[in-house]
From Swiss-Prot:
Recorded name of the encoding gene: PTGFR
Main localization (coarse): membrane
UniProt name for this protein: Prostaglandin F2-alpha receptor
One Gene Ontology CC term in the entry: plasma membrane
Glycosylation sites: 4, 19
Entry-linked Pfam families: 7tm_1
Annotated membrane topology: Multi-pass membrane protein
Upper classification of the organism: Eukaryota, Metazoa, Chordata, Craniata, Vertebrata
Amino acid sequence: MSTNNSVQPVSPASELLSNTTCQLEEDLSISFSIIFMTVGILSNSLAIAILMKAYQRFRQKYKSSFLLLASALVITDFFGHLINGTIAVFVYASDKDWIYFDKSNILCSIFGICMVFSGLCPLFLGSLMAIERCIGVTKPIFHSTKITTKHVKMMLSGVCFFAVFVALLPILGHRDYKIQASRTWCFYKTDQIKDWEDRFYLLLFAFLGLLALGISFVCNAITGISLLKVKFRSQQHRQGRSHHFEMVIQLLGIMCVSCICWSPFLVTMASIGMNIQDFKDSCERTLFTLRMATWNQILDPWVYILLRKAVLRNLYVCTRRCCGVHVISLHVWELSSIKNSLKVAAISDLPVTEKVTQQTST
């Protein structure tokens, strides 16, 4: 019997391959993905080690919330780089032949879920840290009486579960994550969108990401203004100067890195979801914005942890020397960066009556 007319089974992966292609990925090798993944893992591993050491040294109540959220952030970034990077390296090593190594579309679904979760969860955690820090600075009594470590853990769990829920929405709706045009990553359907549900997923992802950035921006701005006001009221304390200067720079760094890295990708996804631009015409741009977003996971540990302790101290000394100003004693900068950054919330550990007395005296 002739086999020329026999029908060959169609792999699910072949139906999920994009009809368009990206030429930008042609010039990249597997070495780029390996280096990129390694840098991210090492950066976040160093941040985790610093946080663990700081947590062992400082176990006060007013510091536990920040340490818990910061640890969750860098751990999320760590596993995001580890899982997504490993899958990307495997895809490159397999010559991007999805039909061969992922006939059942299981790997693409896992890749897409991890991409969405590792994208939204750090943004949610960043906004949660901004809210907690804003309340601790502006309302220390309320922060002490209403926001406990137990509450922070509950909010952290809620944020993680919500990010998982958003990542699982396509699977729950019997939709599949789609292999993108470059054939190196999986995400929501971005090519030839005709169904409202596919648009909903893209718009929901973009809206939640931009909302998290907006909340972080507003809360960090309020915190920064409050710190500047405190600085101007305590000019006689050099320790206050150094501490508030450090906090303002930290907040500016957090806002700038998050907005610069994530805004282009989120806006691109929103534009595709609203049919403002065609994915065929923006494939290379989408890949570029995706890489910008992944850089946020590398820069997070340096902004949140390392930048405050090492760079600001050296920059402070060098700037004053270059300006010809006598360098004052910098014993304050020798303290832990975590201790300095959180000292503004130290009042939250005091009894309510003592807090009221301190606030009245100031």
